[in-house]
């Protein structure tokens, strides 16, 4: 469609001119025809100049108008230049279109830009106005007003005083005039604003100083309070040290009490009733601390006499008595604590002793069982040798018994602490075993249960030997 439009001849515009009845008689109406002669070349390279365009369009037909417009950066990415041409002869338009429509322009970077040639939407062309020279240009020296100005200017320079005092007076007068001038509302507003800003700054600075002063005051009070607390703590420590010294002196003065226990009592009774002992000890202590009747009477009589003697001394005596009472209570507590500690240590020793005995009993029982097994094996081997009359058969068990003895001795030598079985704290029926093992003498397993076990093991050994 675009090519058809370009190839077709442009339409001619018909303009009708209306004439009045009077003009009709004088001038007949004429139809004026306007032909389209102005074209536009679009999509030119953005770096192209007017001189380069004219150079590339040569040879150009007769033109009366050529205007070039460079690319507009605000229309990115559509950065193209364009040119407008107005031909004098309408026939040259078709030839120009055939030549440059689709013509590829190349810029300095080597990029290709195919151009488009079409009629300009606005066909009017700016008229060329002849610039007339101004008649008054270069005639200022002859102007009367300019001459008057020069005379006035040169006369002031001649009249200017050379005395510096007069100059200073004139300058001061001028400054006074300037200062006496009224200020404008805008200047007043600015001055007022500056004044308010300075006042706020001063207020802020004053507040900051006050805050710092209060902070320093609080720190000083805190330091004083801390110092006072330290002094009080040191005083309390000194008092406590003095009290502890008195306490130690009283402890040294008091005789040490040793508790004797009956060895006939069983260990089970001690473990089952540990709570009854402290009560009995407390009762014994109360009996010891309780004074006799004569002492009570003497104390009461003495107290009555002191009350009769004088009241001001009672306060000091009461304080001294309270202190003595506190010291005695502290001593009693310390004594109880030591006694409990001794009792705990004694219980631990008993428990360790019992465990050791239990372990020793188990070890003895195992040794006896092993010795019994060995004896039975020897007896069984002897019987076997008696039944079998062959010398070779009798030699083999002897060798096996010797080998087993060597292995046992080597195993005993190899047995170390880490290879021994772990000690069991509690085994049910271990006490009965120890009692039964203790009365048997050297043979150990004489009971029926031990004999059965020995028989079973002997049978197993026989089966192994047969295999």
Curated annotation (Swiss-Prot):
InterPro entries: Nucleotide-bd_a/b_plait_sf (IPR012677), RBD_domain_sf (IPR035979), Upf3 (IPR039722), UPF3_dom (IPR005120), UPF3B_RRM-like (IPR034979). Belongs to the RENT3 family. Keywords: Cytoplasm, Methylation, Nonsense-mediated mRNA decay, Nucleus, RNA-binding. This is Regulator of nonsense transcripts 3B. It comes from Danio rerio. GO terms for cellular component: cytoplasm; nucleolus. Involved in nonsense-mediated decay (NMD) of mRNAs containing premature stop codons by associating with the nuclear exon junction complex (EJC) and serving as link between the EJC core and NMD machinery. Recruits UPF2 at the cytoplasmic side of the nuclear envelope and the subsequent formation of an UPF1-UPF2-UPF3 surveillance complex (including UPF1 bound to release factors at the stalled ribosome) is believed to activate NMD. In cooperation with UPF2 stimulates both ATPase and RNA helicase activities of UPF1. Binds spliced mRNA upstream of exon-exon junctions. GO terms for biological process: nuclear-transcribed mRNA catabolic process, nonsense-mediated decay; positive regulation of translation. Pfam families: Smg4_UPF3. The keyword Hydrolase does not apply. Residues 197-389, 396-421, 449-467 have a biased composition (Basic and acidic residues). It is found in: Nucleus; Cytoplasm. Residues 435-447 have a biased composition (Gly residues). GO terms for molecular function: mRNA binding. Gene3D superfamilies: 3.30.70.330. The keyword Nucleus applies. Residues 1-30, 197-467 are annotated as: Disordered. It comes from the Eukaryota.
């Amino acid at each position: 469609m675009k090519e058809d439009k370009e190839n077709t001849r442009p339409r001619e515009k018909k303009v009708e001119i209306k004439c009045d009845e009077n003009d009709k008689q004088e001038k007949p109406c004429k139809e004026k025809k306007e032909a389209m002669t102005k074209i536009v070349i679009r999509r030119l390279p953005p770096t192209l100049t007017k001189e380069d365009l004219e150079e590339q369009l040569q040879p150009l037909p007769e033109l009366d108008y050529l205007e070039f417009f460079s690319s507009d950066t605000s229309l990115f990415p559509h950065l193209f230049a364009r040119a407008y041409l107005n031909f004098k002869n309408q026939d040259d338009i078709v030839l120009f279109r055939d030549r440059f429509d689709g013509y590829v322009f190349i810029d300095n970077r080597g990029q290709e830009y195919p151009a488009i040639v079409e009629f300009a939407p606005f066909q009017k062309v700016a008229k060329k106005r002849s610039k007339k020279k101004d008649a008054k240009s270069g005639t200022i020296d002859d102007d009367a007003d300019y001459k008057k100005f020069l005379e006035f200017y040169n006369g002031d320079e001649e009249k200017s005083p050379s005395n510096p005092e007069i100059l200073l007076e004139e300058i001061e007068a001028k400054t006074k005039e300037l200062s006496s001038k009224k200020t404008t509302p805008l200047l007043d507003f600015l001055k007022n604003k500056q004044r308010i800003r300075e006042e706020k700054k001063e207020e802020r600075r004053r507040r900051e100083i006050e805050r710092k002063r209060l902070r320093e005051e609080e720190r000083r009070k805190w330091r004083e309070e801390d110092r006072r607390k330290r002094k009080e703590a040191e005083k309390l420590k000194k008092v406590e040290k003095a009290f502890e010294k008195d306490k130690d002196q009283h402890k040294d003065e008091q005789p040490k009490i040793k508790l004797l226990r009956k060895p006939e009592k069983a260990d089970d009774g001690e473990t089952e009733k540990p709570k009854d002992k402290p009560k009995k000890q407390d009762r014994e202590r109360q009996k010891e601390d309780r004074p006799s009747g004569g002492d009570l009477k003497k104390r009461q009589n003495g107290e009555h006499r002191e009350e009769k003697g004088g009241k001001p001394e009672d306060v000091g005596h009461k304080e001294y008595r309270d202190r003595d009472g506190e010291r005695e209570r502290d001593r009693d507590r310390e004594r109880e604590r030591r006694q409990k500690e001794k009792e705990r240590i004694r219980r631990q020793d008993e428990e360790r002793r019992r465990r050791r005995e239990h372990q020793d009993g188990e070890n003895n029982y195992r040794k006896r069982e092993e010795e019994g097994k060995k004896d039975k094996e020897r007896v069984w081997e002897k019987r076997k040798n008696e039944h079998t009359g062959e010398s070779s058969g009798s030699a083999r068990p002897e060798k096996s018994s010797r080998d087993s003895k060597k292995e046992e001795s080597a195993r005993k030598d190899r047995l170390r602490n880490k290879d021994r079985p772990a000690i069991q704290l509690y085994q049910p029926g271990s006490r009965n075993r120890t009692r039964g093992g203790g009365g048997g003498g050297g043979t150990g397993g004489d009971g029926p249960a031990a004999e059965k076990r020995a028989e079973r093991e002997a049978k197993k050994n026989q089966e192994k030997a047969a295999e």
